[in-house]
């Protein structure tokens, strides 16, 4: 049973029905439904059990640093309660534990809120499932909730329906059945489905090859069929994806930053424990001092000192500062179209070593585009035109001057000119020295790019003769200089002389009539002619986009002279002799016959506008075929406009279903109308019959009546079939016989397109008589489609996004490998990969070499299923040692496995995708990146980052920002650690000397959370280094602080401790008695615990001293403590300035390079002043106001930290240069 269901595609339908015990004519019986429900369950996706709010809260405290702080707060609270026997307790005595607990509660609240809003991917998956299904039960068709669909149910599906479960096709009632399953498989085009069984050799094939299986949640775009359900719920392919997402949720998903912070917490806890125990043991001899009253209280007192030491050592503000820094980074990334859903992912981007990118919709536009076409412009010569791009403008040039790329970048013709010695230029989209005014990456590839851009702008300002084509400046030949930085505009006279531009001709009339009218797709525009809706098969839509975007409108039809033998049975097509009166007529956008300006279209401008429009790509591509029972049935009433019929038939279907790149938008598109350009072509004729596509003919034809009442047959289809049926061909002068030589020339052109992974189509037409309409069976259609006139052919592909090639080159410069993982076929994947620099132009062609990977293999293309069959060791070897890889025909499980192996190898993996099939891999990767416009909700919710512009280039900007954030994070962590080392050193020295503690725990909390917090946050605004994207990515296990850096900050921290203790001691021993306090000697200060045994010890009563003179060492020390705290704060401000750079002096990088830091240091000092001079605050923090002389002393003790750090930087920088010099010598 399991075997039959698993491999239902290799069994006859009758065998499948027999195993499922169901009759295809009656369906399941109602009495057996309960048994099937018990056996197979309901047709719904499981949802992972959600954590309770209590579990979420507990998870926020499952952190070592947090646990240490909780323990410190608890002990502090207990010790404060124990002090009740000695003194009156006030609320301010509990300030330390209260502040710690409050901070932890706030952090937990933020964490719970983020987690509650993050996990929605499973709910999004459930929303993909259709809610209703048409099912046959007890011989009757009925509509039921798809939840109650069971294995063995017979279902009916037609255009616009979503498949409610995995099903085996029983019978197709239309001539063809096409399914849009790109959201599941990643294929860029809709897929033909058949009912016939497949060979046994396909038992373990990938899901893309299962041509007789319909998968749950995929959409029917053409045809009608019945099928039997073979899998429901979690057993379906989309159920497997859900299971993978659940598994990914349960995996350890700690980011590198979280791992580092946890490791830091472990190391810190060990250090704190050692220091606390050491301090406690050092003071063991003082436990019985009279001041404590008893040994127990002495023990508790020094235990409290140890707790204070722990508070000083823990950077309480670190979590808040890290969160703030990441949040600020996300704001900057939003401006660059990267929306961050999980804060920690920002830092992880900085250490990305491998980007695994989906192809369709990520690296490419996810819009099939016509990139090359050919016509017989001359009598015996086939002319091919190829798409070229400059900036936002597209052109078609004669391809005899171009290379055989998918579509010609600028290298194709500029390098051609350069090779001929006519011009020195280099303006390819992916070549060194290239320059483009809008190019975001030119700074990385040319040191003179900024100067060149300025020169270009100046040239533009001085020239008012730019052509409509977007040319920037016409540069005469005599102005050319012999250097690689010469800028050549496309409007240059040199180009006009060298390149033949395509210009629409009236002789191409029938070619475009065939493109538009032999086509069941449609596009709808708003009032500005911007596409807002499109319906139909992606291939047919590419033909309409070609006509619409280049605004090709009907003008004349030519009186072509036909061969005599052809004229015997037909009447020549007559010219309408009418010029187009449309306000968007041909002369507005294209040149006349005397003007050789090239056709232009700002396709990308439309793309930009589509982001703001309600852009829904509905897949009711062939809605007009719904319900057709036979080939050639009258599609529309004779004499009725094709456009009106098409629009009215689609009226109640436009919201039926959508493709995987549907963009949910609430904008109202009720004013959208069919494209004026497309309508103008369809209004040229009235459609009589459609002869639908069949696998045997591989053709589709349409019979129309033009305005002259002539009956014309237009055909499109597979080039080999069209060419075989053609007897003539159309030129600009006449109609000529098509001989074998010309047929071979056409075949060669088509084969060249195929080598470039283009999907090819050819077009033909012929004149019919009224008797030809009396057709009754399929054989009549074969006869009708003979003796055709060849019009031309074209190639389409989903082209790469603008600048994606440069973005990938920049990744390579930054030491990041880019892998393509796609569900598409190997030829298309390889062609795109070469175009965008994932593969080199001349590599990866030999498929046999690709699959026999050895140690020397550097470039590889792999089929997903074959890669899965490799041993784990071989998979690791390939992924570790191969710099460029393309994976094709991959399934969701393959993508997840690739990501898992890469992570096991220690790589930091970023995964991009837009479809449902990408969700498991997005979840598993260190960074999941989804497309925001065309991405499914499933992909978005499974991701960490969403790209608002669907552009791979944005990923590079995000990585740059991630690296900058990490560098800044290192700066403020170093700053905070050195500060905490200073505090620890202060307490340790105090305990070692046996003097009163100079800093109270609440003062340390103030410094750690507030005073240090502002400068630390401001360090997150440090601008990026100029070479941040020219460095290799760091390893995710690299420590934030290495041994040398720690030694460096121990030196600084030791000075901080010495300075804070020294000014404290200075006040007792040497400070002028401006406040009337009594100077004492060092012995008295270091043995203050024995004060009660000194019979004649007398001091002046200052501040809040009691009658007990020994209180001089507790309440009387408030001024000394204030001086100590002020020195600590000012040193920290100087230390923040030192943290601007790890190696560069303040003379090289002045503080005003980061004005946020300057303002933050001033703000921190103002806050410190507030607690000194506002009495209520001064009482809480145990401080008093300082005089001008006091501040002078504070400055004298603080400023040397600048000098000390400058000395350390000098030696550290010199050592760094020596290391670099040594490495260079070794490399040389």
UniProtKB/Swiss-Prot annotation:
State which residue ranges cross the membrane: 64-81, 93-112, 271-291, 301-321, 975-994, 1001-1021, 1043-1067, 1119-1140, 1152-1172, 1186-1206
Q: Which reaction does it catalyse?
A: Ca(2+)(in) + ATP + H2O = Ca(2+)(out) + ADP + phosphate + H(+)
Enzyme Commission code: 7.2.2.10
What is its membrane topology? Answer: Multi-pass membrane protein
User: Which superkingdom?
Assistant: Eukaryota
Question: What's an example of a GO molecular-function annotation for this chain?
Answer: ATP hydrolysis activity
Q: Which residues form the active site?
A: 358 (4-aspartylphosphate intermediate)
Identify the main location: membrane
Topological domains on the Extracellular side lie at 82-92, 292-300, 995-1000, 1068-1118, 1173-1185
Disordered, as annotated region: 452-478, 562-613
Q: Provide GO CC annotations from the record.
A: membrane
**Which keywords describe this protein according to UniProt?**
ATP-binding, Calcium, Calcium transport, Ion transport, Magnesium, Membrane, Nucleotide-binding, Phosphoprotein, Translocase, Transmembrane, Transmembrane helix, Transport
Residue intervals on the Cytoplasmic side: 1-63, 113-270, 322-974, 1022-1042, 1141-1151, 1207-1228
Where are stretches of biased composition, namely Polar residues?
589-604
Q: Where does ATP bind?
A: 716
One family from Pfam that matches here is Cation_ATPase_N
Coiled-coil region(s): none
Location comes to: Membrane
Q: Which family does it belong to?
A: Belongs to the cation transport ATPase (P-type) (TC 3.A.3) family.
Q: Which NCBIfam families match?
A: ATPase_P-type
Function of the protein: This magnesium-dependent enzyme catalyzes the hydrolysis of ATP coupled with the transport of the calcium.
Q: What protein name applies here?
A: Calcium-transporting ATPase
Its gene is ATP6
């Amino acid at each position: 049973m399991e075997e039959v269901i698993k491999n239902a595609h290799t069994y006859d339908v009758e065998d499948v029905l027999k195993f499922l015990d169901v009759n295809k004519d009656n369906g399941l019986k109602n009495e057996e439904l309960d048994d099937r429900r018990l056996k197979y369950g309901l047709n719904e996706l499981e949802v992972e059990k959600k954590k309770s709010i209590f579990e979420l809260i507990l998870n926020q405290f499952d952190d070592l640093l947090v646990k240490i702080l909780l323990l410190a707060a608890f002990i502090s609270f207990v010790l404060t309660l124990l002090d009740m026997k000695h003194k009156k307790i006030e609320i301010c005595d509990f300030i330390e534990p209260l502040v710690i607990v409050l901070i932890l509660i706030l952090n937990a609240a933020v964490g719970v809120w983020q987690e509650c809003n993050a996990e929605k991917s499973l709910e999004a998956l459930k929303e993909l499932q259709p809610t209703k299904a048409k099912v046959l039960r007890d011989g009757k068709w009925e509509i039921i909730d798809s939840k109650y669909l069971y294995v063995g149910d017979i279902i009916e599906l037609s255009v616009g329906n979503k498949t409610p479960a995995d099903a085996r096709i029983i019978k197709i009632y239309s001539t063809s059945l096409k399914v849009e399953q790109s959201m599941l498989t990643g294929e860029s085009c809709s897929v033909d489905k058949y009912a016939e069984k497949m060979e046994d050799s396909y038992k373990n094939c990938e899901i893309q090859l299962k041509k007789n299986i319909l998968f749950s949640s995929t959409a029917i775009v053409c045809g009608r069929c019945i099928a039997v359900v073979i899998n429901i719920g979690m057993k379906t392919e989309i159920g497997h994806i859900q299971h993978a997402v659940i598994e990914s949720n349960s995996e350890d998903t700690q980011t590198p930053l979280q791992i580092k912070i946890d490791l830091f917490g472990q190391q810190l806890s060990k250090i704190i424990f050692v220091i606390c125990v050491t301090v406690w043991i050092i003071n063991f001899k003082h436990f019985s001092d009279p001041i404590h009253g008893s040994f127990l209280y002495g023990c508790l007192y020094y235990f409290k000192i140890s707790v204070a030491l722990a508070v000083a050592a823990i950077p309480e503000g670190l979590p808040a500062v890290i969160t703030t820094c990441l949040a600020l980074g996300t704001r900057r990334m939003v401006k660059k179209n990267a929306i961050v859903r999980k804060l920690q992912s920002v830092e992880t981007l900085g250490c990305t070593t491998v980007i695994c990118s989906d192809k369709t919709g990520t690296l490419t536009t996810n819009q099939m585009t016509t990139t090359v076409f050919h016509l017989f412009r001359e009598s015996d010569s086939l002319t091919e035109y190829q798409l070229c791009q400059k900036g936002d403008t597209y052109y078609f040039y004669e391809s005899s001057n171009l290379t055989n790329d998918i579509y010609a970048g600028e290298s194709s013709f500029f390098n051609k000119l350069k090779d001929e010695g006519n011009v020195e230029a280099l303006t390819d989209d992916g070549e060194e020295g290239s320059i483009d005014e809008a190019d975001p990456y030119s700074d990385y590839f040319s040191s003179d790019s900024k100067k060149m851009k300025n020169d270009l702008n100046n040239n533009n300002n001085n020239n008012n003769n730019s052509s409509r084509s977007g040319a920037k400046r016409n540069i005469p030949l005599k102005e050319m200089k012999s250097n690689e930085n010469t800028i050549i505009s496309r409007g240059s006279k040199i180009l006009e002389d060298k390149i033949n531009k395509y210009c629409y001709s009236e002789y191409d009339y029938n070619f475009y009539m065939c493109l538009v009218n032999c086509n069941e797709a449609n596009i709808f525009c708003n009032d500005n002619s911007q596409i807002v809706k499109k319906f139909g098969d992606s291939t047919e839509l590419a033909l309409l986009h070609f006509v619409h975007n280049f605004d090709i409108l009907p003008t004349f039809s030519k009186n072509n002279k036909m061969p005599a033998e052809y004229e015997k049975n037909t009447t020549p097509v007559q010219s309408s002799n009418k010029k187009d009166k449309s306000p968007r007529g041909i002369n507005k956008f294209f040149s006349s016959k005397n003007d050789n300006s090239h056709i232009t279209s700002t396709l990308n401008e439309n793309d930009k506008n589509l982001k703001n429009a309600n852009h829904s790509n509905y897949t009711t591509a062939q809605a007009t075929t719904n319900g057709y029972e036979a080939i050639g049935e009258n599609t529309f009433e004779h004499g009725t406009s094709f456009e009106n019929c098409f629009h009215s038939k689609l009226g109640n279907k436009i919201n039926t279903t959508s493709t995987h790149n549907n963009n949910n938008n609430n904008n109202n598109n009720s004013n959208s109308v069919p494209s004026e350009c497309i309508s103008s072509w369809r209004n040229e004729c009235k459609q009589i019959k459609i002869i639908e596509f069949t696998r045997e003919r591989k053709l589709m034809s349409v019979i129309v009546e033009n305005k002259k009442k002539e009956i014309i047959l237009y055909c499109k289809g597979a080039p080999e079939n069209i060419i075989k049926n053609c007897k003539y061909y159309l030129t600009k002068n006449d109609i000529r016989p098509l001989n074998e030589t010309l047929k071979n020339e056409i075949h060669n052109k088509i084969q060249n397109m195929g080598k470039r992974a283009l999907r090819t189509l050819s077009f033909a037409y012929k004149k019919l008589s009224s008797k030809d309409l009396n057709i009754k069976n399929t054989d009549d259609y074969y006869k009708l489609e003979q003796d055709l006139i060849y019009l031309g052919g074209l190639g389409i592909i989903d082209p790469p996004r603008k600048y994606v090639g440069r973005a990938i080159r920049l990744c390579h410069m930054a030491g990041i490998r880019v892998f393509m993982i796609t569900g598409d076929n190997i030829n298309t994947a390889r062609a795109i990969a070469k175009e965008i620099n994932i593969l080199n132009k001349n590599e990866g062609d030999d498929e046999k070499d690709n699959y026999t990977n050895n140690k020397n293999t550097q470039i590889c293309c792999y089929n997903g299923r074959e890669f899965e069959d490799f041993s784990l060791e071989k998979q690791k070897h390939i992924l570790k040692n191969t710099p460029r890889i393309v994976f094709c025909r991959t399934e969701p499980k393959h993508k997840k496995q690739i990501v898992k192996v890469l992570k096991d190898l220690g790589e930091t993996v970023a995964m991009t995708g837009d479809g449902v099939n990408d969700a498991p891999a997005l979840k598993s990767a260190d960074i999941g990146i989804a497309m925001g416009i065309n991405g499914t909700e499933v992909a978005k919710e499974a991701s960490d980052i969403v790209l608002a512009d669907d552009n791979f280039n944005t990923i590079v900007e995000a990585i740059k920002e991630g690296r900058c954030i990490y560098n800044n994070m290192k700066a403020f962590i170093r700053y905070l650690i050195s500060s905490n080392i200073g505090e620890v050193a202060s307490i340790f020295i105090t305990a070692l000397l046996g003097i009163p503690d100079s800093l109270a725990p609440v003062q340390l909390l103030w410094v750690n959370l507030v005073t240090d917090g502002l400068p630390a946050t401001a360090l997150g605004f440090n601008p990026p280094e100029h070479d941040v994207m020219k460095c290799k990515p760091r390893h995710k296990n690299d420590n934030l602080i290495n041994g040398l850096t720690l030694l460096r900050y121990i030196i600084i921290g030791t000075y901080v401790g010495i300075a804070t203790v020294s000014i404290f001691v200075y006040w007792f021993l040497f400070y002028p008695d401006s406040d009337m306090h009594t100077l004492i000697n060092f012995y008295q200060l270091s043995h203050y615990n024995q004060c009660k045994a000194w019979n004649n010890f007398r001091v002046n009563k200052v501040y809040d001293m009691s009658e007990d003179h020994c209180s001089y060492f507790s309440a009387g020390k408030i001024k000394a403590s204030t001086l100590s705290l002020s020195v600590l704060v000012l040193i920290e401000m100087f230390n923040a300035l030192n943290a601007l750079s790890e190696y560069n002096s303040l003379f090289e990088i002045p503080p005003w390079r980061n004005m946020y830091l300057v303002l933050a240091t001033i703000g921190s000092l103002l806050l410190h002043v507030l607690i000194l001079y506002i009495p209520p605050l001064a009482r809480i923090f145990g401080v008093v106001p300082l005089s001008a002389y006091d501040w002078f002393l504070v400055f004298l003790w603080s400023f040397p930290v600048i000098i000390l750090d400058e000395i350390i930087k000098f030696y550290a920088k010199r050592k760094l240069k020596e290391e670099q010099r040594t490495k260079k010598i070794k490399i040389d």
